[in-house]
Design a protein with these regions (language model features):
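Positively charged n-region of N-terminal signal peptides that target proteins for export
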Residues: 1-7
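A short, polar/proline- and glycine-enriched secondary-structure boundary/capping micro-motif
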Residues: 90-91, 122-130, 202, 260, ...
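Short, surface-exposed interaction patches in beta-rich subdomains
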Residues: 192-193, 199, 208-223, 227-336
Length: 336
């Protein structure tokens, strides 16, 4: 073994040994006091006594409500399906000082949740846990720190909901609401099923991931810096605007006039089988390509950096209008 290789080996061994020593010291100094939250590990900055500085509400039944107001600075919101016909709430929140970090009021069918000045900010470190990811998922469902968890009956529909989260995520099994107003400044939305009449959502810096979305009246969606993924959609009138991010929509149908504008990002729309020819479609990519391979009708025109596709189905037919300033447009139909 030459001198350089021997030096490298000895240095690596020394660093590994130092890492073991430091990890062990950190563990016994309070590093073991951590918990999992959505998509990341939460690492508490305190020692073992930090558990004493928590505001805890074990799962407890609350009054029924049809209106929901939420205003959080750092907390996450998790809406789950109740196992029965009752409403419940639980949380485990860090606090600064003695003040409860959450103020809430449930009166006359209206639930209001507001993060107070007593809340504590969070510090996150993300790890790829590989084979341990399943364990993390189970743990985070069981014990979520700095997350308010609401349980709503499966068939319950809210009349109004206004949710504002500055630096937190929103996760929901389902949201059934006539009028939904949502604003996330720096967080993600993970929604399995959403049914709305009116849906107004704004995202400054975060991703939107929805498995199933239905909006029967009007939808307004603005995304600043993040990707939007909707696996299945049934939409009426509305507009989707993206500043910097990709849009992916699968198995979608449009029953009104829908406009999609993307400043910087690709747009991919999969329409429900057989619906494209019955829809007025106008696609324009100013600095990109338009791909409509597989569609039997419509006209494509390419000039320099601009690509256009158009299909005319009649004045009474629904309309899909997609424009990309810097990105590609892909339009397909589902197999079934």
């Amino acid at each position: 073994m030459n001198k350089i290789a021997k030096t490298v080996l000895m240095t690596g061994t020394a660093l590994c040994a130092a890492g073991v020593v430091l990890s062990t010291a950190g563990y016994f100094a309070g590093g073991k006091d951590f918990t999992y939250t959505s998509d990341h590990m939460y690492v508490s900055g305190g020692n073992s006594s930090s558990h004493k500085n928590l505001a805890v509400m074990k799962k407890e039944q609350i009054d029924d409500f049809t209106k929901l107001n939420v205003d959080f600075q750092d907390f996450d919101l998790d809406i789950r399906t109740s196992d029965d016909d009752h409403y419940y709430m639980e949380y485990k929140l860090e606090k600064n000082g003695t003040k409860n970090p959450l103020t809430w009021k449930d009166k006359d069918g209206e639930l209001t949740l507001e993060e107070s000045a007593g809340g504590s900010g969070s510090y996150y470190i993300t790890y790829d846990l590989g084979i341990f990811s399943k364990h993390v998922d189970l743990t985070q469902k069981k014990d979520a720190l700095n997350t308010v968890i609401l349980y709503i009956p499966e068939k319950a529909q809210l009349s109004e909901a206004e949710l504002q989260l500055s630096d937190g995520d929103l996760a929901a099994d389902q949201l059934l609401c006539k009028e939904m107003t949502l604003e996330l400044l720096n967080g993600d939305l993970m929604l399995d099923k959403g049914e709305f009449e009116k849906f107004d959502a704004k995202f400054s810096d975060g991703d939107l991931n929805v498995k199933e979305l239905q909006c029967t009246d009007n939808m307004q969606l603005k995304s600043g810096n993040g990707d939007v993924t909707i696996k299945k959609a049934e939409l009426a009138d509305g507009q989707i605007a993206l500043s910097d991010g990709d849009l992916q929509m699968g198995n979608s149908s449009f029953n009104g006039d829908m406009k999609i504008n993307s400043s910087c990002g690709d747009v991919s729309v999969e329409m429900k089988n057989g619906s494209a020819e019955k829809t007025n479609i106008y696609l324009k990519a100013a600095d990109g390509d338009v791909d409509t391979e597989g569609l039997s009708r419509g006209k494509t025109d390419n000039e320099e950096d601009t690509s256009v596709y158009e299909n005319k189905a009649g004045a009474s037919a629904p309309t899909l209008n997609v424009k990309c300033s810097d990105g590609d447009i892909t339009l397909t139909e589902s197999e079934k």
